[in-house]
């Protein structure tokens, strides 16, 4: 699981 990509996606959604 690419947590860094997921983190960036979450920040993008917020």
Curated annotation (Swiss-Prot):
Name used for this protein in its record: Mastoparan-J
Record key words, sorted: Amidation, G-protein coupled receptor impairing toxin, Mast cell degranulation, Secreted, Toxin
Record's subcellular location: Secreted
Sites of Leucine amide modification: 14
GO cellular component terms, semicolon-separated: extracellular region
Tissue expression as described in the entry: Expressed by the venom gland.
UniProt key word Secreted: yes
Species of provenance: Polistes jokahamae (Dark-waist paper wasp)
Role: Mast cell degranulating peptide. Its mast cell degranulation activity may be related to the activation of G-protein coupled receptors in mast cells as well as interaction with other proteins located in cell endosomal membranes in the mast cells.
GO MF annotation: an example: toxin activity
Family: Belongs to the MCD family. Mastoparan subfamily.
């Amino acid at each position: 699981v690419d947590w860094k990509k997921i983190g960036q996606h979450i920040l993008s959604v917020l």
